[in-house]
């Protein structure tokens, strides 16, 4: 998917990119590749691949679960790495107020510089493990939306993300193909942490055979105080 095809696909979903937005994606690609030479941010470096598997992939929730992206919504991105999905979402939806949580300082330095280069406002960077941030009252149950892309299995991911979602808000997981087993496996965790599965959408990225699953979970009750548990515990002993 080259930049022109990217723009065309977005227009099919009623997103007409301004010159500024086109330029932001172009700069994003350029800076990602530049920094990736000395900081390990991504294995995907070819322009068409970045536009498809990073940029387009990141914005699929906007047209799959568009109804939850209210103007001025607060969004927390857990383990964003090189800024996916939150930075592409922010470029397309500038009213979003974004908080990015990542445990690696090098990635956050990249993101800090990227945000400046792209001229983005209302983006906060938090250095820490999701388990610790989820127990911090500055962030716990404060967000309308929490996203995570390819971070961990649903049973683990729910414990990272749901404590950050405010009651009535949503957790959006961007997964690969055939996430059915993961969802079954993660059902207990969703219940325990106060979430309820609303929708699961399977899609294929355009001009490719790349299959994806998007999962939408609503926070229907508060997360018990003991969650998230200590850093490392959710991965070692997922809720079952």
Swiss-Prot record:
Cellular component (GO) terms are: cytosol
Q: Which UniProt keywords apply?
A: Cytoplasm, Methyltransferase, rRNA processing, S-adenosyl-L-methionine, Transferase
Q: Where in the cell is it found?
A: Cytoplasm
Transferase keyword on record = yes
EC number, as in UniProt: 2.1.1.-
**Has UniProt tagged this entry with the keyword Nucleotide-binding?**
no
* Enzyme class per UniProt: transferase
Q: InterPro entries per the record?
A: rRNA_ssu_MeTfrase_G, SAM-dependent_MTases_sf
- Gene Ontology MF, one: rRNA (guanine-N7-)-methyltransferase activity
Q: Where does S-adenosyl-L-methionine bind?
A: 79, 84, 130-131, 149
Q: Which coarse location class describes where this protein primarily resides?
A: cytoplasm
According to its UniProt record, which protein family does this protein belong to?
Belongs to the methyltransferase superfamily. RNA methyltransferase RsmG family.
Q: Which PANTHER family does the protein's record reference?
A: S-ADENOSYL-L-METHIONINE-DEPENDENT METHYLTRANSFERASES SUPERFAMILY PROTEIN
Write out the function statement from the record: Specifically methylates the N7 position of a guanine in 16S rRNA.
| The protein's name in its UniProt record | Ribosomal RNA small subunit methyltransferase G
Q: Taxonomic lineage of this organism?
A: Bacteria, Bacillati, Bacillota, Bacilli, Lactobacillales
């Amino acid at each position: 998917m080259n930049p022109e095809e990217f723009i065309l696909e977005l227009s099919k979903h009623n997103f007409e990119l301004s010159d500024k937005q086109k330029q932001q994606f172009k700069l994003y690609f350029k800076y990602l590749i530049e920094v990736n030479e000395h900081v390990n941010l991504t294995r995907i470096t070819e322009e068409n691949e970045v536009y498809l598997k990073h940029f387009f992939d990141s914005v699929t929730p906007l047209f799959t679960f568009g109804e939850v992206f209210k103007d001025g919504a607060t969004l927390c991105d857990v383990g964003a790495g090189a800024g996916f999905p939150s930075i592409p979402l922010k470029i397309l939806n500038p009213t979003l107020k974004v908080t990015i949580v990542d445990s690696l300082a090098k990635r956050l330095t990249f993101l800090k510089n990227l945000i400046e280069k792209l001229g983005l406002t209302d983006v906060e960077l938090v250095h820490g493990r999701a388990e610790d941030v989820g127990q911090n009252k500055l962030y716990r149950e404060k967000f309308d939306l929490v996203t995570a892309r390819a971070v961990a299995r649903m049973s683990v991911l729910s414990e990272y993300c749901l404590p950050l979602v405010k009651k009535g808000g949503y957790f959006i997981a961007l997964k690969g193909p055939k996430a059915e087993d993961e969802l079954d496996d993660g059902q207990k965790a969703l219940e325990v942490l106060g979430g309820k599965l609303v929708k699961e959408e399977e899609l294929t990225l355009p001009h490719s055979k790349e299959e994806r699953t998007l999962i939408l979970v609503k926070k229907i009750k508060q997360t018990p105080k003991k969650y998230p548990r200590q850093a490392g515990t959710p991965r070692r002993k997922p809720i079952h």
